[in-house]
């Protein structure tokens, strides 16, 4: 009885072993491996292989009981697959949603030292770094699918880095940290969807598993990697600041190593790729090694080259702390988009098509180097622009204008306009504008010369608050605002500048006949280049212009520079002033014939679309006056306010203001200035007699001057009356504070007078 039970147990074990042996032979493994497997390993491997049938239903064809005809192509495919697996610098693995390794190729032993049998069927979490468990869980998790239920299967790409356990010898393991090796894994998560019979529009999905390929990153030592012609290496600090670069970088990117040292890698990477580079940098600091995505490294001559980098953190041999970053970079393409500048460090191969001034044709400033030396203090520093300069963009703004939300300086914009190309249609000239920002555009109402239809359309009339004259003065000094720029109210069109700038005075006057008569107040035939004096004070207009210099480009052969533009503007405004004084002496009929009967020039602020400003600098109102009225008179060395003289309603011509300190004012202009100071004009003139040739300044203008700044080009008010006297005078004008300061900060020189300087009347805040 005892013998029978022993024999029965032995027979049962033999049958069990034979069944396990037969089962092991069904596994797609070499017989040398299967013959050494124990029962637990056979069950583990068999279970894992059965799960693989879910991922790949075709399986192994005949080995899974399917009879099919084999062709020579199938045999070639199998052999090719085995060879590809051997030549692959990595290993293939399939992981179930629960983390069990369903399959891993035998090449894993080359990179990790762990056998295929040992890994298959076990949890991948047992072989990865504990800090990477959460990342692995996120990779294996499938979110709610967004695909239609008609799609049965789809794949979600995955790319991640894992620190896997490595048991290889130190000389063969490459770079390891704490017994773990960084493996770059890339593959896809396979999702299968099923539709429900009861509800055709509903369905469920199944997370089949992850199929990925694991690659070992190259070791850090450069001596262990053969650098080919399309590769270069660099060493950087932990913040990616370059310390050392290989000499091959010069022929691949155009930069010499010394050009890149002490700059971060982010400084030379395309802006759209900095996010991917930042993520790779973060992974590098956490895991010690990383392979970047393809990114664009900017070339020196413009454009970029596509690069992929293998970066490694090198630890200090003594302290075992991170020391630096060593990266091997593969340049994958030639330079693309050559000449496209994306960085200040890049040099364009060809100059931009849009330009300010010509580099081949000499300009006026090139022929007048003697006069230019007198303006040496206003020479500006060169500034290289990374982008082509288009005329539609106002790139030159004063950095001292912090109150403006656009960061633009009014005087800088006036002194340095950007000119349009006359070759293009509709761009014969561009206006030089000085911007002022107004909190409420309704404070400026329409003038007398505006058509009544527009007054009715916009429903704005002169109120007691606006007082009419303030609006008229605002329109004269500020002009019409540019269309399409809502935040700016009061864009003054100083003067239209043509593209061509003739060198001679006669040619320049012929090209701009509408403003040439201003120049004659300094004497007939006088061409002055010293009319603009720079300012050493910060925040001035000249400093705004000094900060940048017009760059030499090629497609504008006759454009003036910023200094020449301001000089000519000053000279032409002076000429126009004398012309107005001469026209005042003509009879009304002659004035009407000169200015054109029925012609009205009154630019104002409105909501409707306005046409571009015309060439006339003076936009006079329809209020007539045969002679200027003296608002400011001197009695026994004192200045009296308009309230004391009852001249509140008589206009004062702005053209009569002059500077007694100027050394170039002619005798006739001095007589006019004297006549202005001592004449007593009665306010008996009525509106409508004849158009006023010069804009008039009423007593109501003073309140407008208190709020806004105006530039009186060509005169120095601070030398006609001192600031304290003007301040006392303003106390008589409704108690408002009135101050006169020079924006250019030009103090009088006892040895030399001012030559066509510019001042600004500003509020005293």
From Swiss-Prot:
Q: Where is this motif: Nuclear localization signal?
A: 368-387
The domain of life for this entry's organism is Eukaryota
Q: What is its main location?
A: nucleus
Entry's Gene Ontology cellular component terms? nucleus
InterPro entries of this UniProt entry?
bHLH_dom, HLH_DNA-bd_sf, PAC, PAS, PAS-like_dom_sf, PAS_fold, PAS_fold_3, SIM_C
Q: In which tissues is it expressed?
A: Detected in lung, skeletal muscle and kidney. During fetal development it is found in the CNS, developing kidney, mesodermal and endodermal tissues, including developing somites, mesonephric duct, and foregut.
Locate the Single-minded C-terminal domain: which residues? 336-765
Q: Name one GO biological process term.
A: ureteric bud development
Give the matching CDD domains: bHLH-PAS_SIM1, PAS
| Segments of skewed composition (Low complexity) | 352-365, 373-385
| GO MF annotations, alphabetized | DNA binding; DNA-binding transcription factor activity; protein heterodimerization activity
**A Pfam family per the record:** SIM_C
Which first-to-last residue range defines the signal peptide?
A: none
Subcellular compartments: Nucleus
Compositional bias ranges of the Basic and acidic residues kind: 394-404
Cite the entry's keywords alphabetically.
Developmental protein, Differentiation, DNA-binding, Neurogenesis, Nucleus, Repeat, Transcription, Transcription regulation
Protein task:
Transcriptional factor that may have pleiotropic effects during embryogenesis and in the adult.
Quaternary structure and interacting proteins, as annotated: Efficient DNA binding requires dimerization with another bHLH protein. Heterodimer; forms a heterodimer with ARNT, ARNT2.
What is this protein identified as?
Single-minded homolog 1
What organism does the UniProt record list as the source?
Mus musculus (Mouse)
